Amino acid sequence: MGSVARIMTRFLFSVVNSAVSWDSEVFLSDDSLCEIEFWSNNVHVLNGKIYWGASSLPVRVSCFSDASDSACGAFVESQPELTFHQNWSLAESVRSSTWRELKAVCLALEAFASRLSNSKVFWYSDNQNVECILRNGSRKCDLQELALVVFQICLLHCISLEVKWIPRDLNVSADCISKLVDFDDYGLNDIVFQGLNHLWGPHTIDRFSCSYNAKLPRFNSRFFQPGCEAVDAFAQYWGYDNNWLCPPVCLIVRVIKHMELCRAQGTLVLPLWKSAFFWNVCARDGVHWNSFVVDWVYLPKFQGLFVPGKARNSLFGSRPIDFDVVALRVNFRRPRPPSSLAGFCSMPDGKCYLCS
């Protein structure tokens, strides 16, 4: 049983070491009880078998991962579209390099798991401790917990994992991914979202988010993330859903054009920047919302309107906002009559000489 026996007896081994003698009573921790339960349920299946390093699975895949002090990244060599990236929080960024490298394996493996099912996976890392811990476990609880997560993912998805160390100069691609910083790592305040969801929902999918800031169970992400339904929202058809859209500012025009292409509906959050490049796409005359906007509201202006993600110095959320933010109800299926201007004026008083 190789690595399985070593990894799944670490906490029990600690319990044995704590005994004064073989006849003394010991305290069984929750982790050690979980290991006992695991062996009770699986010893008859695993006994006499080499599970972790099995070579009988026909599909063989190579994965590479790395972690920097700001983020982590990974990719599947034969499937370049399977690329994972996630920022570190401040607390995560100060953890040991081994913890970050091991966490990167956990997160990436979880993100890729459904695509790697029933495969023999060779996982390459430039941290030698990762190879050792995933073979033998660790005496450090935080590292052992991560090793167990990796093992459980493999068990659930029938993945045979073999971890190998490679020199840093052979892991350049994963290293580059891990050094990306997503400055659009923010989301809308949960209470404000719930209000909009009650007003125009229920929304069915969050098109621009990640595993730790998604507002809905279904979400799209820029990179593969644990739980994401699809990567690249613009490669998806939006016409069947009530879309929740809080995109990076640089993508607002593309969002509107894609909604038009799909004849989609949804709620779009954007800053009220009348000098911005996207403004004429939203308000052709510079004042009144275009006919695809069927309703709209100002969002309350307070410091917590946008919630920062894990990245430091994100565009919104890391400092107080001094501008208005609006939520537009967009409907390309049933736009309002273009001549209907009353109530759709973006002037401070809510009206101008054309619509008063």
Predicted regions and their residues:
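A short acidic-Thr-Gly-centered motif at the start of a beta-strand
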Residues: 48-58, 114, 229-238, 257
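RNase H catalytic domain
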Residues: 109-173
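Mobile genetic element proteins and their domesticated derivatives, centered on retroelements
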Residues: 8, 12, 64-66, 74, ...
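A short, polar/acidic, helix/strand-boundary loop motif
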Residues: 78-103, 111, 128-145
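C-terminal functional segments of enzyme domains
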Residues: 1, 158-200
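C-terminal reverse transcriptase regions that engage the nucleic-acid substrate
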Residues: 1-54
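Class I S-adenosyl-L-methionine-dependent methyltransferase catalytic core
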Residues: 204-356
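Two-metal-ion RNase H-like nuclease active-site motif
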Residues: 56-70, 105, 206-210
